Design a protein with these regions (language model features):
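Catalytic cores of nuclease domains that cleave nucleic-acid phosphodiester backbones
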Residues: 2-15, 20, 67-164, 170-171
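Charged, glycine-rich intrinsically disordered N-terminal tails and low-complexity linkers that flank
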Residues: 1-81
Length: 171
């Protein structure tokens, strides 16, 4: 198996344009890993799928195409907000700060509880890097990992192990 060395950003050397989903480093454009992976799959045609599901069956039996598209957009927005809150909570938790008064949605609370009961207890976490940016100069690829953490051999894995988490908020 070939090993590809990936660099990790420790400063602001990598910039990300969220709207265009493009990374730049030293004025060079890098393809996001998400964009790269999309090349291997057919594009999801939300309009056509919503049209087909409208007034069909199950949870869509009483929904129009527009209502379905709105529902999907709301779920995407909710997922983005959950990611933001979990990221903020992790940054605060590992820097001994307080979270504040902002209420957390149920899925963010579930992510927090999962972290506290499954990750911290089982893996003996040392370092945590939420929204960790990585890149490869030769391939001009870059991406952001939802959270990476270093843990030791007292847990389920070997010493100096790093694990990566990709938060999902779907059912």
């Amino acid at each position: 198996m070939a090993v590809i060395k990936v660099s990790v950003i420790s400063n602001n050397a990598l910039n990300f344009d969220e709207d265009e989903h493009i990374y730049t480093r030293n004025d060079e454009e890098y393809t996001s890993v998400t964009t790269f992976i999309k090349k291997f799959f057919s594009e999801f045609d939300a309009e056509a799928v919503a049209e087909k599901k409208a007034y069909s069956y199950g949870k869509y039996s009483d929904k129009s195409k527009e209502e379905i598209l709105d529902m999907w957009q709301q779920k995407a927005d909710d997922g983005t907000e959950v990611h933001r809150l979990i990221e903020e909570w992790l940054r605060i938790k590992y820097n001994d700060e307080e979270f504040g008064d902002e209420p957390m949605p149920v899925k963010a609370i579930q992510g927090k509880e999962y972290w506290e009961t499954n990750i911290e207890e089982d893996y003996f976490v040392h370092d945590v890097w939420p929204e960790l940016q990585v890149y490869h100069d030769d391939y001009k690829l870059a991406g952001t990992i939802d959270v990476a953490f270093k843990h030791n051999s007292k847990g389920k894995t070997a010493k100096r192990q790093v694990s990566l988490i990709d938060w999902k908020t779907n059912k």
